[in-house]
Amino acid sequence: MLKIGVGPSSSHTLGPWRAAEAFLKELREKRLLSKTTKVHVDLYGSLSLTGKGHATDLAVMLGLSGADPEYVPIESLDVIITAITNNQKLCLGNEQIINFNPKENIVFNRNFLPFHANGLTFTAEGEDFNYTSTFYSVGGGFIVKEGVQAATKEETRRNFPFPIDKAEELINYCHQEGKKISEIVYENEKSLRTEEQIHNELMRIWHTMLECTYIGCHTEGVLPGGLHVRRRAYDIHKNLIGVVTYDSPQNWLNSIKKTNIKFREILKWVSCFSLAVNEVNASLGRVVTAPTNGSAGVIPAVLLYYVTIENQQATEEHIQQFLLVAGEIGSLFKKGATISAAMGGCQAEIGVSSAMAAGALCELLGGSPEQVLIAAEIAMEHHLGLTCDPIGGLVQIPCIERNAMGAIKAINAAELAIETDPKNAKVPLDKVINTMWQTAKDMNSKYKETSEGGLAVAVNMADC
């Protein structure tokens, strides 16, 4: 659920990038890569309508080139793209040089494929073959290949000591085992990897979150894309931190802990953290999908709030606990609804990320398993129906500010949940997840990451 990748979008950048990698793998397995002389890519639906603003075409080129979004140096991205565009050649899988004109070989088709709003088809041609494969980017960087039967729910559940599809099941396990939500999730993770691997991966995710927040707080200027959006995290951070010297993200955190913090400063710090992450995301920087790139700022902002303000003695164990709970709550939404704005609007992104952060924070504040899920429910309840209408198809307006609002709501939801007797709660998390999905299905496609309605129409690119 929490994955390291490159911005600006998990569904429109990371997903297509991963699809291109999967296509390369197929070509290698069929021993066709070295015989390929041409590759054609068709983008459909939302990938086509907002693909330019979301850098879908660039992601496809980078994926076909063999670059890994987790590890490729960010500074090399422009070099790779410029070389392909200027030379009209692409080194397929970093092995086979082919002719490739992005304007001709990547086609934006406005029509939608039936399975999902984010479809893309790759076609490889050689002297004696023509191989085609279609993928769907279903949100959060996850992809599905057309025609491949996914593992059944029963097969998936069989792999875990505590199989979970619904919040009710999660609570039942907590009661049966006398464990916190994070402990139940940890036991499930242990069926997939060692304790050392779990710890190392969670810390890698945390350090990526910290690094991108640090970069965002120390980078000024204007975001790319034509909206001329000025970065704000830099100025907010400068006003908050004062005249202090530090030489690393960790020393920076220590400096923040020493600042004078009252209610207004809390609001500003949380907003600053979230803006910083999403400004990095909007400039094709490296972030953690949480659960998406467009909502990547909420969870780091709330976690940083906890370690710098709420509990300045927080340890790696607290961070691990937070991420485990957040990931499980996100998984519940993915299984019961969607984490794709192209399917459910922004409630599927900021709404889900706010619910994830609220539940995770609630456990760290001492909330019971019931209160953790109440926190997640409160956060989502107040995002239901939120539209996805990015101006110019860019993950900037209103996306960046929405992360700040989602983070503040998450903190408030956690505090409300702590003060709630679970016996008096009226809306179970499973009900709000189902309601979110019904709302998503009822929502007009204009408000599902197509830039055909809402702010995307009301505010002209020329006005910016």
What are these regions (language model features)?
Residues 1-5, 270-278, 322-330, 376-379, ...:
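Short alpha-helical scaffolding segments that buttress acidic/His motifs in well-ordered protein cores
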Residues 2-20, 283-302, 346-354:
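Conserved phosphate/anionic-ligand binding catalytic regions in large, soluble enzymes, centered on
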Residues 11-28, 300-312, 358-366:
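Alpha-helical support elements that line or immediately flank enzyme active sites
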Residues 65-257:
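C-terminal regulatory domains involved in ligand/effector binding and gene-expression control
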Residues 196-313, 317-345, 454-464:
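Accessory "access/gating" subregions that flank catalytic or transport cores
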Residues 239-242, 401-407, 413, 417-464:
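C-terminal auxiliary extensions adjacent to catalytic cores
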Residues 266, 291, 295, 318, ...:
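Secondary-structure capping and boundary motifs in well-ordered enzyme cores
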Residues 313, 325, 331-404, 416-427:
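Hydrophobic alpha-helical bundle architecture
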